[in-house]
C-alpha cells in the first residue's frame, strides 16, 4: 500500500486515515507497512543527487506566468487537462541551485516507446510534448514523477495498473528509470469511471465518497465496482470471499 501524499499542503492525515479505513472495511489491508510519500524525502534526495552528478538536472527560475508568456509569444496556448511544454528557457543558463528555484530533468530528444497491456504500442516525444520536466518544485516539494519512480523500485513493483488519464505520464517515468538505472515495470492503463457530465469520478470533481459504515454497505460498494469492471455477480455475504472470487475471475 502506498499513499501518494507528496503534495503535503493538499494532503491531510485525516484524509489518509479515511482512505485506509475504507479499504480495510472492504477487506483490503496492506501486507506491509503503508508507504507514505510525505515521509520519503531522503530517498528522493538520493535519486536527485545521482541525477545531478551526471548533469541530468538543472535549476530553473521560471514561474508559471513566465512560461505562459514565452509560449504565448510562440503561439502556443495552454489546454485543459494537458501539460504545457516547458520552452527550455533556463536549460543553458547554468544557474546555481538556490532556494525558490525548481529543478528539472534534461529530457533527451527522440521518441520513448513502450508496450501497454491494454492500449498496445505507445510512443511519446517528451522533449516536444512536455519538455524538461520538474523533479523538485520551487516550493521545495517533490514532483510526482520522481517520487513514483523511486517508490515503484523500492516497493518491488513489477506491474503498474492505473487509469488511462495517467498514460501520458509513463514516458516521463521511463526516462527517469533509464536515467537512474532502475527497472521498468509493465504498464496497463484502464478506462476511467465517468460521471454523467463526462468528468472522472474523483474528489477533485466532488464525487461522493464510499459509504462503508457497515459490512453490508462495504460489500455493496465492492459489488458496484465489480459491476463496472465487468466482473461476474456472485452470491457472497462478506468482502473477503467476494474479493477472492473476483481475483480468480480477473482476466488481465
Tell what function each PLM region has.
Residues 1-76, 164-182, 236-237, 241:
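N-terminal Rossmann-like or analogous alpha/beta NTP/dinucleotide-binding catalytic cores
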Residues 19, 48-55, 78-81, 201-210, ...:
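Short, charged low-complexity intrinsically disordered segments located at boundaries
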Residues 32-33, 56-62, 80-90, 127, ...:
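Short, exposed beta-strand "edge-strand" segments with a Pro/Gly-rich flavor and a Y/T-containing core
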Residues 40-45, 146, 150, 190-191, ...:
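Noncatalytic linker/hinge segments flanking ATPase motor cores
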Residues 65-213:
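Active-site cores that bind ATP or allylic diphosphates and position pyrophosphate for catalysis
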Residues 94, 108-110, 199-252:
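Non-catalytic terminal extensions that flank enzyme cores
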